[in-house]
Design a protein with these regions (language model features):
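PLP-dependent class I/II
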Residues: 1-7, 11-17, 22, 29-36, ...
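A glycine-/small-polar-enriched, mobile loop at the entrance of the PLP active site in fold-type I
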Residues: 40-43, 58-77
Length: 392
């Protein structure tokens, strides 16, 4: 009898995505006839704008069906570089851009070429759940820098300064934030820059995937534009999923110092190779095209974010710092005495509401609800949440 195959240590340590698991469970229950209301989605519920779909279809029909450069189509890399230069205030050339299979692969590639055993990643908490897993897959250790609503879910400069050690290699910044909706202002970034100037061995990766999704009165600032003197150790990860409603297209990008981006491109050439060729022409149309569709979707999210936030603030025992961007709310529900996983299980089983436990994001006091749903679905979800909490 053959010996059983043994998984590698890194595979055994890997945790599957809880958000995807919850979404799959909700779909399964719905297919079984259960009345399920899901506020767990991390993707826009809009269709990709027609002009983007048309451009991809035209590229397909015109023969863009072969292998392309591993780093991405040259026109798309140049268009992304131009966008970063003109819109974000970060001077970028096309050889500093790598087109990836979504923002997640951009992070994976970067971590694999930059991190290794003995390296430390500084991660503000709450955090997007894939950050620690991706860092650990690269052999690095993760040091959490916790925050909460009383601090606005913001990384404090003095907290960062105290956390940095000789082993610290990379700081992760995510603004607007998943899951909290926090937006780092210019003053926040300037204070972080002051600290990093004292620690030249620490690089920064800025996840800007929600840059277009901002509540009124808030602005997005690219860290490399605020602190251009640090640009030689700042990486930007972004993509088309959230702003252009292109989650299934799987097109993101990594931008930053040439040598590291080149290494990430070499890694990609030995793994997935190029992103789907004709899909890149849809992305090219998106980044070069008018922003009307992006603005219209962002406005819809503003209305839904307000609806969700105001509804949560009326429920007894629920504490919420109103989100400033992205399309999530992250209320504290610890007054009910249940850990977040237990509460989310009861919500799904008893009232058919699918949301994500805060423990997945590093804060067991909270749950994450998405406003990437119709207003009617948001109202339905709020009613189910209030009904379940009232029964506890």
């Amino acid at each position: 009898m053959p010996a059983p195959l043994t998984l590698s240590a890194r595979a055994q340590a890997l945790q599957p995505s809880l958000t995807l698991a919850i979404a799959a469970k909700a779909k399964q229950l719905r297919s079984e006839g259960r009345d399920i209301c899901s506020l767990s989605a991390g993707e826009p519920d809009f269709d990709t704008p027609p002009f983007i779909r048309t451009a991809a279809a035209a590229a397909l029909e015109s023969g863009h069906t072969r292998y392309g450069p591993a780093a991405g189509e040259p026109e798309l890399r140049q268009a992304i570089a131009t966008k970063l230069t003109l819109e974000n205030g970060v001077p970028t050339s096309s050889d500093q851009v790598l087109v990836t299979n979504g923002g997640k692969q951009a992070l994976y590639n970067l971590f694999q070429v930059l991190l290794g055993p003995g390296d430390e990643v500084l991660l503000p908490s709450p955090y997007w759940l894939s950050y620690p897993e991706l860092a650990q897959l690269a052999g690095a250790t993760v040091k959490l820098l916790p925050s909460d609503a009383s601090a606005g879910f913001r990384l404090q400069a003095e907290q960062l300064d105290a956390a940095i050690t000789p082993a610290s290699k990379l700081l992760i910044l995510n603004s607007p934030s998943n899951p909290t909706g926090m937006v780092l202002g210019r003053a926040d970034l300037e204070a972080i820059a002051v600290v990093l100037r004292r620690h030249p061995h620490v690089a920064v990766v800025c996840d800007e995937i929600y840059e277009f999704l901002l509540a009124p009165g808030h602005s997005h600032h690219s860290f490399a534009a605020v602190a251009p003197d640090l640009a030689d150790r700042i990486f930007i990860v972004n993509g088309f999923a959230k702003g252009w409603a292109m989650t299934g297209w799987r097109i993101g990008w990594l931008a930053g110092p040439r040598a590291v981006v080149a290494a990430a491109s070499a890694l990609q050439s030995q793994s997935t190779s190029n992103v789907c060729t004709f899909a890149q022409y849809g992305a090219l149309a998106a980044v070069k095209g008018p922003r009307d569709c992006v603005i219209a979707m962002a406005e819809q999210f503003n209305q839904r974010r307000t609806l969700l936030s105001e509804g949560l603030q009326t429920i007894a025992g629920v504490t919420l710092l109103a989100p400033q961007g992205a399309f999530y709310a992250f209320p504290d529900v610890s007054a009910y005495g249940l850990d977040s996983m237990a509460l989310c299980r009861r919500l799904l089983e008893e009232v058919g509401l699918a949301v994500v436990p805060g423990v997945a994001f590093g804060d067991d006091r909270c749950i994450r609800l998405s406003c990437a749903a119709s207003p009617a679905t948001i109202v339905d979800g709020l009613e189910r949440l209030e009904r379940c909490l009232a029964s506890l």
